[in-house]
Amino acid sequence: LGAKYVLKNRSDLRIYKEFSFEYLKSLLGAYPVLGTKVPLKGRIVTFVGATGQLFLPYWLQDFLYFGYTDDIINLFDIKQNERDIANAPAYFKREYKYCTGEDMCREVVPEIYITKMFLSKYINIDDSVKGFWECIKNYFMIVDWEDLSAVLFKYDSYNRNDGDTNGILNWKESHRMISHSICVSIINGYLKYGDWMEKERFNYILHGKKE
């Protein structure tokens, strides 16, 4: 493509903070890739999620990806998913009386599919939080919405943006998002994995109610 870096984002996503591109490039310099099994020039940068994804393996948001051009091309050089699901929320409401984080991981929603298919080209992955965190530590970086003054039209967030968030941070389990600070804590080894984390996705109720 002739460009060293590329930012891939949704067409309804707006970034308003000046020098955002310089900030994203600086993250690649400050946090080099730690692992050697996945051939990346630098980390792949994604946004913090709209729901708590800290314990949902391989759920990295697809609102935005930033990195070296060759790395982002490689990220999307994966087999196309042939499932005929036009509307994921409608599908889950139809198929599940209540939907848990485990259901979302088992069904492999698009964001998870991209991450898992990319990584599985180079390493054996399982659906464990431990493996997920190891990949975050080695290959990814998360930025917060306010880092880029980002606003997303989806979820009517233009009408609910308060200047610091993009309007979506009131979602369930928002306290368990993989924020930038959480990501850095994982990378630097201060946030420690525990076996109890593997069961947490069963407690995420993303819609419906247990009877």
Feature map (PLM): residue ranges:
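ER/Golgi luminal nucleotide-sugar-dependent glycosyltransferases, focusing on the catalytic module
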Residues: 1-9, 13-211
